């Protein structure tokens, strides 16, 4: 089976914050690392890229009197460096919407939709002060559905409804704040109404789509799908391919969604295997995973599958769409202008990146909005990582050194007591329990099961008390306890790997087990470290955050923020 893992493409006009990271890219990376161990790295592909077209970039370029691509070149490379080199995101291909492969594919694909594309004149908001047609997101006003006063012209962040600028009450240009006029302009529309029942049936029949995703998407479908404009009056974008649309560009949402396909095409083009991309899009033996934020649900669960259906080709429709709710920062929404939150180029200066990876998965808002706090961060690092995982690993391996010079003792299956049998059963079962949750997009829930296993292992060790067995000369029982213990440490390393790859490798180094990336997920369920194996050097796995960490962190953040701001590319300052 081929496994395609994707994450929503970050828009390059700002550095992603922690909420953006956990909502898509980090979640996708954790799953991709799991999938490679489970299904083999040769069968898993993880792609994403920079979303770089549209009005925000165009306006910024006009202000600075530069070509938009100059700005996005810098921003793309900056984000790419952060993802790949700092946050250890294991993309197989992190590309961009300015890729020639992407632009070519998008234009060719949209021409396949002509049966469902209609041309009509539409009233488009135009700012007389800025002398600019305003795309949906550059018009703000009051949501007609929930009354939220800061709704965008494409979507209300409060109730999640998709909008058009003409629906807003008291619309304003988000650049200058003045009321726009509405001018007629010819545009090309994708008639979603043709797919209302097909999309409804597809969503309803899915056994793998999470309930929160189904609920949002079916709510939108039940209101009746309407034609959505494919084209915009922007200059900075992919030129529309339709006859008569030479002065138009393609709406960024339509082209960015197609990036999931073009990124796979580009990956295999670079490998000289130009037809192999089809194995990830046209075979029956595929499973695809999309990691997104909840505000992106309608685009991924309605517009993308409708486009794939409309193409007339047998594209594989999305399987698991794992959409997070919002991550709050100390009870507030992240805000760049008000400096509320932490951004992904700031966070590594405050704490080890892999601590961040673990903390963010532990706080992943899978079913409801979740509040990030520094207090909870300290608890997770000091209690779960250090006291639970790190302490257990150290105790088992240190005792193996102390009592057996680091050599795994002989195992006697005929001399097991009930506690031994229970712990072996846990080792046998836990990889499947965690894996099944991961495959439903429930990474936080899977991690909670891993921690439950660690706590059970700690309880087993305390109950068996190897130090007392050693003193009492109970060699067979001591042998079995540490044999089971060292194998449970291997299990913990494999379960931890998707979240903390370097620390998991450190455990494998202590076990003298080689490269964990070449391991198989299912080996975590087996007692595979055998009698006579010599472990490596034991060292401290984690370090606790200092008692004053929480009280000092905000001052530290303020100090580093100014220096980091200077290092950012022009577009991201």
Swiss-Prot record:
<protein>
    <recommendedName>
        <fullName>Methionine--tRNA ligase</fullName>
        <ecNumber>6.1.1.10</ecNumber>
    </recommendedName>
</protein>
<dbReference type="InterPro" id="IPR009080">
    <property type="entry name" value="tRNAsynth_Ia_anticodon-bd"/>
</dbReference>
<feature type="short sequence motif" description="'HIGH' region">
    <location>
        <begin position="10"/>
        <end position="20"/>
    </location>
</feature>
<dbReference type="GO" id="GO:0004825">
    <property type="term" value="F:methionine-tRNA ligase activity"/>
</dbReference>
<dbReference type="InterPro" id="IPR015413">
    <property type="entry name" value="Methionyl/Leucyl_tRNA_Synth"/>
</dbReference>
<comment type="similarity">
    <text>Belongs to the class-I aminoacyl-tRNA synthetase family. MetG type 1 subfamily.</text>
</comment>
<dbReference type="GO" id="GO:0017101">
    <property type="term" value="C:aminoacyl-tRNA synthetase multienzyme complex"/>
</dbReference>
<feature type="binding site">
    <location>
        <position position="336"/>
    </location>
    <ligand>
        <name>ATP</name>
    </ligand>
</feature>
<keyword id="KW-0030">Aminoacyl-tRNA synthetase</keyword>
<dbReference type="InterPro" id="IPR029038">
    <property type="entry name" value="MetRS_Zn"/>
</dbReference>
<dbReference type="InterPro" id="IPR033911">
    <property type="entry name" value="MetRS_core"/>
</dbReference>
<dbReference type="InterPro" id="IPR014758">
    <property type="entry name" value="Met-tRNA_synth"/>
</dbReference>
<dbReference type="GO" id="GO:0005524">
    <property type="term" value="F:ATP binding"/>
</dbReference>
<feature type="binding site">
    <location>
        <position position="143"/>
    </location>
    <ligand>
        <name>Zn(2+)</name>
    </ligand>
</feature>
<comment type="function">
    <text>Is required not only for elongation of protein synthesis but also for the initiation of all mRNA translation through initiator tRNA(fMet) aminoacylation.</text>
</comment>
<feature type="short sequence motif" description="'KMSKS' region">
    <location>
        <begin position="333"/>
        <end position="337"/>
    </location>
</feature>
<keyword id="KW-0436">Ligase</keyword>
<dbReference type="InterPro" id="IPR023458">
    <property type="entry name" value="Met-tRNA_ligase_1"/>
</dbReference>
<dbReference type="GO" id="GO:0006431">
    <property type="term" value="P:methionyl-tRNA aminoacylation"/>
</dbReference>
<feature type="binding site">
    <location>
        <position position="146"/>
    </location>
    <ligand>
        <name>Zn(2+)</name>
    </ligand>
</feature>
<dbReference type="GO" id="GO:0046872">
    <property type="term" value="F:metal ion binding"/>
</dbReference>
<keyword id="KW-0479">Metal-binding</keyword>
<keyword id="KW-0648">Protein biosynthesis</keyword>
<keyword id="KW-0963">Cytoplasm</keyword>
<keyword id="KW-0547">Nucleotide-binding</keyword>
<dbReference type="InterPro" id="IPR014729">
    <property type="entry name" value="Rossmann-like_a/b/a_fold"/>
</dbReference>
<dbReference type="GO" id="GO:0005829">
    <property type="term" value="C:cytosol"/>
</dbReference>
<keyword id="KW-0862">Zinc</keyword>
<feature type="binding site">
    <location>
        <position position="156"/>
    </location>
    <ligand>
        <name>Zn(2+)</name>
    </ligand>
</feature>
<dbReference type="Pfam" id="PF09334">
    <property type="entry name" value="tRNA-synt_1g"/>
</dbReference>
<feature type="binding site">
    <location>
        <position position="159"/>
    </location>
    <ligand>
        <name>Zn(2+)</name>
    </ligand>
</feature>
<dbReference type="Pfam" id="PF19303">
    <property type="entry name" value="Anticodon_3"/>
</dbReference>
<dbReference type="InterPro" id="IPR041872">
    <property type="entry name" value="Anticodon_Met"/>
</dbReference>
<keyword id="KW-0067">ATP-binding</keyword>
